[in-house]
Amino acid sequence: MHKPNITMACVVHCKGKFLFVEEMEYGKRTLNQPAGHLEKDETVLAGAARELLEETGIRAEMQKLVKIYQWHAPQSQTDYIRFLFAVEL
């Protein structure tokens, strides 16, 4: 049985600007949305709020589900299902 990884991400908007986090991915610096993996016994809403807090120090509730999509990371040959939420600060 195929089991893709479940991830959550947040599009954070505040005063006309969007928030990104800086990460290293395959040896290159990249900008990304605050995001991460779902933990055991966690809802996707709670997981998204936790990741936002861990990566930015911002405590906020997810306000809108923007999109659910599946993608394949070619370097790691890993499949993901991502829940993308919006947060307005």
Residue ranges and their predicted role:
Residues 8-10, 65, 83-87:
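A structural signal for short, well-ordered beta-strand segments
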Residues 5, 13, 33, 45, ...:
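Short connector loops at helix/strand junctions that flank enzyme active sites
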Residues 1, 39-43, 76:
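Residues at secondary-structure transition points
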Residues 1-19:
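Conserved N-terminal beta-strand and adjoining loop/helix that marks the start
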Residues 71-89:
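Active-site-adjacent beta-strand/loop module that shapes the phosphate/pyrophosphate-binding cleft
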Residues 59-67:
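A short coil-to-beta-strand element that immediately follows conserved catalytic motifs
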Residues 8, 33, 40, 71-73:
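Generic structural "secondary-structure junction" signal
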Residues 14-54:
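Conserved Nudix-box catalytic region and its N-terminal flanking loop in Nudix hydrolases
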